[in-house]
A protein has these predicted regions:
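GH16 jelly-roll
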Residues: 1-208
């Protein structure tokens, strides 16, 4: 498979986490906790059934990997979710994430970017870039998506489908290349979607 280099032409590495510590580096990451109701977003805006917690049953580091596991305990689904809010922002560049994905009905692995001004400029006006999402019942297909506001909610999605395989079988590299004019999505360095700024009035993607 594709292994990401530390640098690309005209780019320098500015942030990385190889998960080689014994526990998650909270200078880089925050834990999302509970069901979202405390922040007025029950179900985290997606009708999610699980309860996020900071527990090694659900989220831990092992052998240089971040391992997130969904569990069912006493009738409650638990899982883990982390973010970099107030710890790191980026405007333009390339993001690579190497991951092996789970499958199963109701499973929804995802890697998202949200506008850092979301507290002042609520979603979707702040903009959202979904670097990768996969529906657990379709483990051979991932998607890249943007969400934004242009006189109303707008979304645009592209798909990448594996041939005679699925994303649970081995690690793949999911990438986003982003500049002021275009956003591009890749799987194992193969480009499968581009989204261009064609004078969109509500284009929020020139901000961190």
């Amino acid at each position: 498979g594709f292994y990401t280099p530390e640098t690309y032409p005209s780019m320098n590495l500015v942030w990385s986490d190889e998960f080689n510590d014994s526990e998650l580096n909270t200078d880089l990451w925050n834990y999302d906790l509970a069901d979202g109701c405390a922040v007025g977003l029950c179900g985290w805006g997606n009708n999610e059934l699980e309860y996020y917690r900071q527990d090694t049953t659900n989220i831990k580091l092992k052998n240089g990997k971040l391992v997130i596991t969904a569990t069912l305990d006493g009738g409650t689904y638990y899982s883990g979710r982390i973010n970099t809010k107030n710890n790191f922002t980026i405007t333009f560049g390339r993001i690579d994430i190497r991951a092996r994905l789970p499958k199963g009905q109701g499973i929804w692995p995802a890697l998202w970017l949200l506008g850092s001004n979301i507290d002042q400029n609520p979603w979707p006006a702040c903009g959202e870039i979904d670097l990768m999402e996969m529906r657990g019942q379709e483990p051979d297909r991932v998607q890249g998506t943007v969400h934004y506001s242009n006189g109303g909610y707008v979304t645009n999605t592209g798909f990448y489908v594996l041939d005679q395989s699925d994303f649970t079988e081995q690690y793949h590299v999911f990438s986003l290349v982003w500049d002021q004019n275009k956003i591009s999505w890749y799987v194992d360095n193969e480009n499968y979607k581009n989204f261009s700024n064609s004078g969109i009035a509500g284009w929020p993607f020139n901000n961190p």
